[in-house]
């Protein structure tokens, strides 16, 4: 008989993700990585360049955000995520802001159509990750 029980985020364990991030994945309900996550996370975690294509809603943001956050936790530097639209920037920021604080990082969003003063204040806090659109 095969044991079908799983440990928290068991499917993510073999991908080299830090324990705090694994715990967060489990708490947020992510139990099994999607195909794009299975393929992308190990490659991105090694710091390699890649291109990933997948349908909307398949977890592409987690596929690049988790390795980026983990890399930044291990060394100095900053992360920049440039996306083409304000809406996508806000979506990416929502995901990044769920995970980055777990490893002591802040993220900021810099987009058009929002208060420049508020965005400037966020940047003065020296976030490690900036999510932005090219227009700003």
Q: Model-found features: residue ranges?
A:
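Long, low-complexity, intrinsically disordered polar/charged segments
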Residues: 1-10, 66-86
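Conserved pre-motif I regulatory segment
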Residues: 2-53
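The conserved Walker
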Residues: 54-58
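Short alpha-helix boundary/capping motifs
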Residues: 53, 69, 127-129
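Walker A/P-loop NTP-binding motif
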Residues: 38-50, 60-76, 87-90, 94-99
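Short aromatic/basic micro-patch
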Residues: 35, 63, 131
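Conserved nucleic-acid-binding Ia/Ib motif block in the N-terminal RecA-like helicase ATPase lobe
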Residues: 14, 19-30, 76-136
